[in-house]
């Protein structure tokens, strides 16, 4: 099994947090804001989410680790 590393996403992001509304941009369009909201409501989203005003955000390291756990290589 090939391990997929997404750490480069965090290295290129200009902040230590990612707003839920920016997850689509952060993941290159592979994960949408609505999908994240649905997973969060089921308790299946990344750990450590928090709110700033009306916006939900994720610590970047938690988001990357969560994405890596959910990622499967198709080149096996």
Predicted regions and their residues:
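Major-groove DNA-recognition helix of helix-turn-helix-type DNA-binding domains
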Residues: 3, 26-60, 73-75
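DNA/chromatin major-groove-contacting recognition/catalytic segments
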Residues: 65-76
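Polyanion-binding surface elements
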Residues: 2-38, 68-69
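Short, well-ordered alpha-helical scaffold segment located
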Residues: 22, 62-63
